[in-house]
Amino acid sequence: MLIHQRTLQNEISLTGIGLHTGHECTITFKPAPVNTGYIFVRTDINDCPEIPALIDHVVDVLRGTTIGIGDVKVHTTEHVLAALYGLQIDNCRIELSGPEPPVLDGSSNPFAEALLSAGIAEQDEPKNYLVIDETIEFHNPEKSVDIVALPLDGFRMTVMVDYKNPALGSQHSGLFDLDKEFLREFSPCRTFCFLSEVEAMANQGIIKGADIDNAIVIVDKQLDETEVQTLADKVGVDASHLVLGQNGILNNRELRFSNEPARHKLLDLLGDLALLGMPVKAQILAXRPGHASNVEFVKQLKKYADRNKLARQYQHEKKAGVIFDINAIQNILPHRYPFLLIDKIVEFKLDEKIVSIKNVTMNEPFFQGHFPGNPIMPGVLIIEAMAQTGGIMMLNGKENIKESVVFFMGIDKARFRKPVLPGDTLVIEAVMTNMRRTVCQFDAKAYVRGELVCEASLMATVMEKKN
């Protein structure tokens, strides 16, 4: 894979109609400095507001991915972003004279060809790859969607679609080399829908810019003349221009590839993956993906990336099975011996869950008085260990971590199930249940040899230290 970041040599523009809004728009791709990423700019609005193409800015996923900040939005970003991501361009300023990029032929190819004609320039800064070193999974059982990222020193993507619709059936496609395959094998693949969906989408106020030249319509139902006329009126075309066809595609249009729908789903996933803000080294397997599931999957990748960033910041020596060792913990928490009551963090999902380990030894100072001849770890110190575990989850991500401290506001439903003795290993799991600004609630449980020994619900807040 490429080493250095890339941008454009020159700017280039394209003009056309937006797929869903139907508004005419000119899109202009411009070079951008290193570490800029992709930034959409609405030049048709006063002050030309900018919207970075990042997953946190996704506001809608109805038949496309829409990003926005406040009232300013950019619709259907996926084909543009797929072209940039597929050509491995890292930094680009994307100016729009309307709310939606032009659909053109319904694929990414016109954008990709335009970007190549503008020229690609290598930059001095190295690419910031997200390297996947563990399995990351997204599942939606209700929609039978599964997307998985696996460790790989490179990039591959495989997509399977199965609409349980005899007009399309099951298809799959795989991309194994961006350099060799993206431009010719995937960028030309057009957006598609089923004939049975067209009227409903028109009633939703979308596909205003769609026509038979920029979308594949798969015929999955037969229509009589009256129904054809009704459909034509809905989508604003002449009924004489609609032919159900003999090949299963409206107007007998030919597919560019036998599995073009599956390839287009892969293209959409590439475009949504670009919202991560960095290229990925991984093998990605996706069954029945769509924009909603793509976005949720990328959110999981972002949490993984944020966690890794924090781990690199505090954990200077990589250790198998350890996210933060005792040295990293002391860089995060202000506690010190004898009141630092956790030894390492072994699992960490940002803003979701954290698991710590506390090795309980006879050398603990509290065993001298609790109790002589019958040493038992005080329950309040188990609660404190839970609190410190949750505190790490709360403090991570704070830029001024050295100037922050966690204060506890409440302890509820505390239960002590079994005594903790010298030689035991406490495994403490804290799961965030609510986060509002600086106040966090989480449920904590402590285990010894797989048995629950203590549990409690805790509430805490992050505040700045007072001098």
From Swiss-Prot:
Catalytic residue list? 291 (proton donor), 370
Question: What subcellular compartments does it reside in?
Answer: Cytoplasm
Pfam families recorded: FabA, LpxC
Q: Name one GO cellular component term.
A: cytoplasm
Keyword annotations of the record: Cytoplasm, Hydrolase, Lipid A biosynthesis, Lipid biosynthesis, Lipid metabolism, Lyase, Metal-binding, Multifunctional enzyme, Zinc
Which reaction(s) are listed as its catalytic activity? a UDP-3-O-[(3R)-3-hydroxyacyl]-N-acetyl-alpha-D-glucosamine + H2O = a UDP-3-O-[(3R)-3-hydroxyacyl]-alpha-D-glucosamine + acetate; a (3R)-hydroxyacyl-[ACP] = a (2E)-enoyl-[ACP] + H2O
Named from the GO MF annotations, one term is:
UDP-3-O-acyl-N-acetylglucosamine deacetylase activity
In this chain, the stretch annotated as UDP-3-O-acyl-N-acetylglucosamine deacetylase covers: 1-306
Q: To which pathway does this protein belong? A: Glycolipid biosynthesis; lipid IV(A) biosynthesis; lipid IV(A) from (3R)-3-hydroxytetradecanoyl-[acyl-carrier-protein] and UDP-N-acetyl-alpha-D-glucosamine: step 2/6
Q: Where on this chain does Zn(2+) bind?
A: 79, 264, 268
The protein's matches in InterPro entries, at most eight in alphabetical order, are given as: FabA_FabZ, FabZ, HotDog_dom_sf, Ribosomal_Su5_D2-typ_SF, UDP-acyl_GlcNac_deAcase, UDP-acyl_GlcNac_deAcase_C, UDP-acyl_N-AcGlcN_deAcase_N
Judging by the UniProt lineage, the source's domain of life is Bacteria
Cofactors = Zn(2+)
Q: Which GO terms describe its biological process?
A: fatty acid biosynthetic process; lipid A biosynthetic process
Per its UniProt record, what SUPFAM superfamilies does this chain match?
Ribosomal protein S5 domain 2-like, Thioesterase/thiol ester dehydrase-isomerase
Region 3-hydroxyacyl-[acyl-carrier-protein] dehydratase: start-end pairs: 307-467
EC number per UniProt:
3.5.1.108, 4.2.1.59
Q: Which HAMAP family match?
A: FabZ, LpxC
Family under the similarity heading: In the N-terminal section; belongs to the LpxC family.
Q: What does this protein do?
A: Catalyzes the hydrolysis of UDP-3-O-myristoyl-N-acetylglucosamine to form UDP-3-O-myristoylglucosamine and acetate, the committed step in lipid A biosynthesis. Involved in unsaturated fatty acids biosynthesis. Catalyzes the dehydration of short chain beta-hydroxyacyl-ACPs and long chain saturated and unsaturated beta-hydroxyacyl-ACPs.
**Record-given protein name:** Bifunctional enzyme LpxC/FabZ
Source species: Chlorobaculum tepidum (strain ATCC 49652 / DSM 12025 / NBRC 103806 / TLS) (Chlorobium tepidum)
Its ancestry begins with: Bacteria, Pseudomonadati, Chlorobiota, Chlorobiia, Chlorobiales
What gene name is given for the protein in this entry? lpxC/fabZ
